[in-house]
Structures are given as C-alpha cells and as structure tokens.
UniProtKB/Swiss-Prot annotation:
Belongs to the TCTP family. Residues 70-172 are annotated as: Required for reduction of TSC22D1 protein stability. PROSITE patterns: TCTP_1 (PS01002), TCTP_2 (PS01003), TCTP_3 (PS51797). Homodimer. Interacts with STEAP3. Interacts with TSC22D1; interaction results in the destabilization of TSC22D1 protein. Its main location: cytoplasm. One of its GO terms (cellular component) is cytoplasm. It comes from the Eukaryota. This is Translationally-controlled tumor protein. The lineage of its organism: Eukaryota, Metazoa, Chordata, Craniata, Vertebrata. GO terms for molecular function: calcium ion binding. It comes from Oryctolagus cuniculus (Rabbit). The keyword Calcium applies. The modification Phosphoserine is found at S46, S53, S64. The gene is TPT1. Residues 1-172 form the TCTP domain.
Length: 172
C-alpha cells in the first residue's frame, strides 16, 4: 500500500486504495471516493463481557450515531476548512512559494513545469471556486496542502484534487 502525505505538514492525505488519475498535464492527482455511512459508538454486549441485564430496562445500552461522509475524508481524518476567494488566493500564493522551495531542494527539474502548470490550474480552480469544499490534513497545519473536494456531473460521486508535487509517497 502507498500512503500519500503532504510534503509540508507530513499529514496523511490519501492512499492507493482509491481510483487515482493524473489531471492537468500530470500536475494534479484526482482521487475518486464514495459516500459512506458508518456507525460510531455502538459497542457489542459481547465486548463488554456479559449479557444484557435482566433487571435493567431494555435499550439502556450504549448509544450510537451514524456518520455519513466521503470515504477519503473519513479514512484519512481530513479536516474541513473554508476560504473566501481572496483568502484562497493569498493561501495558494504562499503555498506555491513553499512547494517551489521544496522542489528547488529535492527535484529542481520540476520547478519550471510546476510553476507554469500551477498558474493554469489555479485559474481553473478560481473559475470554479464555488464548486469546491476545502480540506486540510489531520494536524490542521495552515501552511500545508488544501485538498479540493468536488462532485462529478452525477452529483453523487465525490472526487478530490491534490497537487502532485505537494505530496510524498510512503510505501507500507
């Protein structure tokens, strides 16, 4: 299994269990997820080490809640955040500088294609700004990558967009 981590915050963003494809000329990765529902807080009586009490009233056990969301977000503990268009422009400008710095250290041949492609991709993001929900890694580092969540034309299938050069891969 391959875990994709944020190059700056080192937060886990997603893994290779999802359908992943390169978009924007290889600049970004599009990761397709699905909506899932999970029950949390429900504890099986057998795990407590006994049977339901014959003396107590019925249904007094543990409470459970059902949480529905996108599997990528839930599995990797991504945190939703929000941006105005102006705030996102400021964030993305600083983020691009950070990634450019990392690339200059680690992969200098990627600097020019990244900066050229990123400018185009950012124009596309800003043109479709209202369609996106924004997610950051579990540690909520404001300097880290902000992943974009959108839905396919069917309105049901979620997908997330990540800048490929802002990720590091870790084999497990």
């Amino acid at each position: 299994m391959i875990i994709y981590r944020d190059l700056i915050s080192h937060d886990e963003m997603f893994s290779d269990i999802y359908k992943i494809r390169e978009i924007a000329g290889g600049l970004c990765l599009e990761v397709e997820g699905k909506m899932v529902s999970r029950t949390e807080g429900n504890i099986d009586d057998s795990l407590i080490g006994g049977n339901a009490s014959a003396e107590g009233p019925e249904g007094e056990g543990t409470e459970s809640t059902v949480i529905t969301g996108v599997d990528i977000v839930m599995n990797h503990h991504l945190q939703e955040t929000s941006f105005t268009k102006e705030a996102y422009k400021k964030y993305i400008k600083d983020y691009m500088k950070s990634i450019k710095g990392k690339l200059e250290e680690q992969r200098p041949e990627r600097v020019k294609p990244f900066m050229t492609g990123a400018a185009e991709q950012i124009k596309h993001i800003l043109a479709n700004f209202k369609n996106y929900q924004f997610y950051i890694g579990e540690n909520m580092n404001p300097d880290g990558m902000v992943a974009l969540l959108d839905y396919r034309e069917d309105g049901v299938t979620p997908f997330m967009i990540f800048f490929k050069d802002g990720l590091e891969m870790e084999k497990c």
